[in-house]
């Protein structure tokens, strides 16, 4: 499917620039604000594009549901590129919630979606210092795992549920830095409270200046597992927000319901990790007191008394 679409695009003259070259900044006069904007743009990071053959090989290893997510992203990005031609209009964003338990390959899908989006959207004259796609997560560890940044640092989000808007200078810098933004990836969506979803909606509108478009016309891709614990001091992202500031928007067009749900179901882990992940996935959905004796026995093998030497090198300890 990807190969066929590439041939069609080449016929329309929409193939990407072979060098993916930066604009020649020497041609432009850069004032103080633009210089600071450029420095801040670098914070968002660049998405490295591997050899196309390698990308295609990795894509072929995806299961059916994983591939469906990547195909949606590629199709959307190709439509965005085609919309740059006279007479064509921008496509409506395919907002989605990619839901999957441990081991279903969410991180792999995020990586490939980012790479294919970058490869497809970058054409001759693209400014690679301005992100086309941003990878974010609620917590710093999760953000680092996907090569991204936290939501709060990316969009200068403040604590609390009320939306105060960006300062004049911050707004100007973000508008310049993110003027080419097409896709926003949010990992560990279960940690994002409902009010934060609506704050993000308003921030993106403020940045893109597309106030009538949900999420400012940016395609939002949420990844995670809603069976995990809800946000601390907040409602789950699919619930009604607490702050009355978002009540009308929630009543007319709930932002969560704009996300098309795509489920990743296949466990891709191997050996003991796969077996343990399967048990954890069953724990997520089983009724209280209904876990099998086999699953309980496996969980008991992971129990250690306080002070045990195994705890010294354990990355995560659960205490009860």
Predicted region positions:
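Conserved ATP-binding/catalytic motifs of P-loop helicase motor domains
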Residues: 1-320
């Amino acid at each position: 499917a990807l190969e066929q679409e590439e041939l069609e695009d080449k016929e329309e003259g929409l193939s990407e620039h072979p060098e993916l070259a930066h604009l020649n900044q020497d041609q432009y006069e850069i004032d103080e604000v633009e210089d600071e904007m450029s420095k801040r743009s670098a914070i968002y990071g660049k998405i490295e594009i591997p050899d196309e053959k390698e990308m295609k090989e990795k894509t072929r290893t995806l299961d059916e549901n994983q591939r469906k997510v990547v195909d949606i992203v590629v199709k959307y990005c190709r439509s965005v590129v085609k919309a740059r031609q006279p007479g064509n209009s921008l496509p409506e964003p395919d907002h989605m919630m990619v839901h999957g338990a441990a081991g279903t390959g969410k991180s792999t899908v995020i990586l490939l979606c980012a790479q294919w989006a970058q490869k497809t959207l970058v054409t001759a004259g693209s400014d690679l210092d301005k992100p086309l796609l941003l990878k974010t997560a609620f917590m710093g560890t999760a953000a680092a795992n996907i090569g991204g940044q936290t939501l709060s640092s990316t969009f200068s989000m403040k604590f609390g549920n009320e939306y105060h808007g960006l300062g004049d200078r911050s707004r100007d810098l973000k508008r310049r830095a993110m003027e080419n933004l097409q896709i926003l990836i949010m990992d560990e969506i279960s940690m994002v409270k409902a009010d934060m979803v609506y704050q993000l909606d308003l921030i993106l509108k403020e940045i893109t200046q597309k106030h009538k478009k949900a999420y400012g016309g940016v395609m939002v891709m949420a990844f995670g597992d809603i069976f995990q614990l809800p946000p601390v001091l907040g409602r789950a992202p699919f619930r009604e927000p607490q702050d009355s500031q978002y009540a009308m928007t929630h009543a007319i067009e709930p932002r969560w319901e704009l996300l098309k749900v795509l489920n990743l179901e296949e466990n891709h882990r191997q050996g003991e990790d796969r077996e343990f992940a399967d048990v954890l996935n069953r724990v997520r959905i089983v009724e209280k007191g209904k876990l099998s004796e086999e699953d309980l026995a496996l969980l008991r093998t992971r129990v250690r008394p306080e002070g045990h030497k195994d705890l010294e090198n354990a990355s995560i300890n659960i205490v009860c």
